[in-house]
């Protein structure tokens, strides 16, 4: 995990939401004048964005975090607070045999072997160090004797924050960000990611609207921020954007609710495509068969359904097939 976060700073732009490769596309004009210059611009204030900001600051960079919503945390702060932690003390307490190789196998199988094996290995091999970073660096408190099993996992291997929410991690990250003096710019909408005029040149910075009022497009004051070392993209998913998700998968239309926060929209997915990124498998959107359509957001019914089926039962479709 330490290696990954530091390696993010070596390139012009790093992507936290999806694997991307360069392609030809139009780019926004380079501003005649930069209003502000920093080393690193992090877009997004969830788990990944805050972790990147913390490590970049510790590595000696001048960092800012941009968040379009009025509060930090994104989907991360409202999620279930569970973390895959192969090799953690909770597994050892319950004498659970697990390994990085088994976790890799489970991830590849769940992805119909369409995953990038190198990325899967990175995720699996750093599962324990992620947990240790949360505990040792941030002081996150997980339930000390509880270990759970999600669907698709061969053995129980997830730990849960004491408060049962992603806020148990995000709030600790926010404390560390504040301690390190990293500013989080709320209500700051990224309008453009600026590359050099040569279409395949480096990312130079971003053009934003400060004082943005979600979801009012164009609200706020425009500002150009130069990033000397790079822009780290951690803006999350787009499941609250009905139009864009329906474009990816027509079945996911407005009749389907989402557990995502309202700001999980597609503008930066579209912007990264415009600057020459090729996004992959955008139509592979996770749906929760354990959810209750009569409950808003996650609700509480999933807690029984998930445990009953994933740990003690099995999933079947409408035709009764596993």
Predicted regions: what they are:
Residues 1-15:
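N-terminal secretory signal peptides and thylakoid transit peptides that target proteins
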Residues 11, 68-183, 187-189, 199-202, ...:
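Conserved N-terminal/central alpha/beta ligand/cofactor-binding core
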Residues 34-46:
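Beta1/beta-strand and adjacent pyrophosphate-binding region of the FAD-binding site
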Residues 49:
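N-terminal Rossmann-fold NAD(P) dinucleotide-binding loop
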Residues 62-67:
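Short beta-strand "acidic-cap" motif of Rossmann-like dinucleotide-binding folds
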Residues 195-224:
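Conserved beta-strand-loop-beta-strand element in the redox core of flavoprotein oxidoreductases
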Residues 213-220, 226-296:
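Glycine-rich loop(s) and the adjacent beta-strand/alpha-helix scaffold that form part
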Residues 288-322:
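FAD cofactor-binding and catalytic pocket of flavoenzymes
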């Amino acid at each position: 995990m330490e290696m990954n976060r530091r390696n993010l700073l070596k390139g012009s732009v790093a992507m936290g939401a999806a694997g991307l490769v360069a392609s030809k596309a139009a780019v926004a004009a380079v501003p005649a004048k930069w209003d502000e210059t920093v080393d690193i611009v992090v877009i997004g204030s969830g788990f990944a964005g805050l972790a990147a900001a913390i490590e970049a600051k510790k590595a000696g960079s001048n960092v800012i975090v941009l968040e379009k919503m009025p509060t930090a945390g994104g989907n991360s702060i409202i999620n279930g607070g569970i973390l895959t932690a192969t090799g953690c003390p909770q597994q050892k307490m319950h004498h659970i045999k697990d390994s990085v190789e088994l976790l890799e196998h489970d991830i590849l199988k769940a992805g119909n072997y369409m995953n990038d094996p190198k990325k899967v290995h990175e995720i699996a091999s750093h599962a324990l160090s992620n947990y240790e970073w949360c505990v040792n660096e941030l002081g996150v408190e997980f339930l000390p004797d509880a270990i759970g099993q999600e669907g698709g996992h061969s053995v129980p291997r997830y730990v849960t924050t004491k408060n049962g929410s992603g806020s148990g991690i995000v709030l600790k990250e926010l404390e560390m960000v504040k301690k390190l003096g990293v500013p989080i710019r709320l209500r700051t909408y990224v309008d453009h990611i600026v590359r050099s005029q040569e279409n395949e040149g480096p990312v130079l910075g971003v053009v934003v609207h400060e004082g943005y009022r979600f979801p009012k497009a164009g609200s706020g004051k425009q500002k150009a921020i130069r990033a000397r070392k790079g822009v780290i993209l951690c803006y999350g998913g787009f499941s609250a954007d009905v139009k864009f998700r329906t474009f990816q998968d027509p079945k996911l239309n407005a009749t389907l609710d989402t557990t995502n926060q309202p700001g999980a929209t597609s503008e930066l997915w579209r912007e990264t495509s415009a600057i020459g990124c090729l996004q992959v498998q955008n139509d592979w959107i996770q749906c929760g068969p354990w959810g209750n359509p009569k409950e808003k957001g996650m609700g509480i019914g999933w807690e029984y359904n998930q445990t009953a089926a994933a740990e003690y039962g099995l999933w079947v479709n409408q035709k009764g097939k596993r």
